[in-house]
């Protein structure tokens, strides 16, 4: 009777695991394995305990924007009064304020056309007396002057002239016109020089062609005409002398 061989027990996994190769068998032993290091380079500065990473920077940004909004609200809540009224001296503040009101009224009257009846009417006594008092106190404070020029100043209504300043559009228009004028002058100068250069080149070529015709003439035998060449040279020497 033939001997029966037992089934191979050491085969890799039977039918289900046929063809699989474990990675341990074919691992290269010469290559060094990378060890895990806990202190690797971080993607941001600081740590969670220190609190100086991206979260801390985001917190600072939010605080800055909040403070900026508070400053804007304070600026918008401030009353829009004239900043110069607080700087007046205390003993002359009422005079400056009265003068401001008087100038405002004069400007309003100057803007509106007056009728004939309003022109003929004299100034009221209260206004004239207040104007006199203001002008007299000004004269006494600023410089001790006689009473006559002060009275003359009272009668004449001094309306400040409006400074006619040029707008940015007008300034830009003037600058553009100046630049255009400069460009036109440069273009004319360039055209003039170009014409002069072309004229000089034309005369030079004409003269060279005449000389070439004289020197290129030949005799009946086809030889260069030396007599004409000598005459040309003598003529040139005489012109130089």
Swiss-Prot record:
Region Disordered, annotated ranges: 1-21, 107-201
Swiss-Prot/TrEMBL keywords: Nucleus, Transcription, Transcription regulation
Annotated Gene Ontology cellular component terms: nucleus
Top-level taxon of the source organism: Eukaryota
Bias (Basic and acidic residues): 186-201
The keyword Membrane belongs to this UniProt entry's keyword annotation: no
Compartments (UniProt record): Nucleus
Cited InterPro entries: Fyv7/TAP26 (IPR013730)
Start-end of Low complexity biased regions: 151-160
Family note: Belongs to the TAP26 family.
Function: Component of the transcription complexes of the pulmonary surfactant-associated protein-B (SFTPB) and -C (SFTPC). Enhances homeobox protein Nkx-2.1-activated SFTPB and SFTPC promoter activities.
Subunit relationships: Interacts with NKX2-1.
Protein name, per record: Thyroid transcription factor 1-associated protein 26
Native species: Bos taurus (Bovine)
Gene name tied to this protein: CCDC59
